[in-house]
Amino acid sequence: LKYAHINKQLVEWQELVPTFTNFNQETGLFYSLWLEELTDYRSVDREYKRLIKNYANTTDIAPMGVVPPNVVNLSSIPWMHFEHFSSHQGAIKNNVTPMITSGKYEKVGSQLLMPVNIKVHHATVDGYHVSLFFEILQREMNR
């Protein structure tokens, strides 16, 4: 998940920056935010809440400025549970940026189920890597 295609070169990032959209309730529009250099859940949670509060009323699509190039797109559709989701990014030439999308969780029996979809470019990520991602995600969710 750490690769990008920049100036006809394949680049491997040492670190990824999670970028996510938030919803302006008043305008009905989304805007992009991101979290940098955070290493533990508490700092991520604290910074996420601070960003959401500080930019709640923005009308700018990228109120923090220029989006870093080393991003992984995190997307959420909390209004619905899904079995598959596809976001077409064909208009962005040579886009190999991964996108992880989660949906509304549901309780089924004694289990809490949350759909998670990952979109990757096969030139940089193989099924093996996707399976590692889901293995780690499941382990963390079980904690």
Label each residue range with its predicted role.
Residues 62, 69-76, 80-113:
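Flexible, Gly/Pro-enriched loop and linker segments at secondary-structure and domain junctions
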Residues 1-18:
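Hydrophobic "lid/gating" helix adjacent to the active-site nucleophile
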Residues 24-79:
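Helical lid/core segments from catalytic subdomains that handle acyl or acyl-like groups
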Residues 16, 29-31, 114-116:
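Short amphipathic alpha-helical segments
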Residues 16-23, 87:
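Short amphipathic alpha-helices and their capping loops
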Residues 63-84, 123-142:
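Short flexible/disordered coil segments
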Residues 1-4, 35, 42, 54, ...:
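Active-site-proximal acidic secondary-structure segment that organizes catalysis
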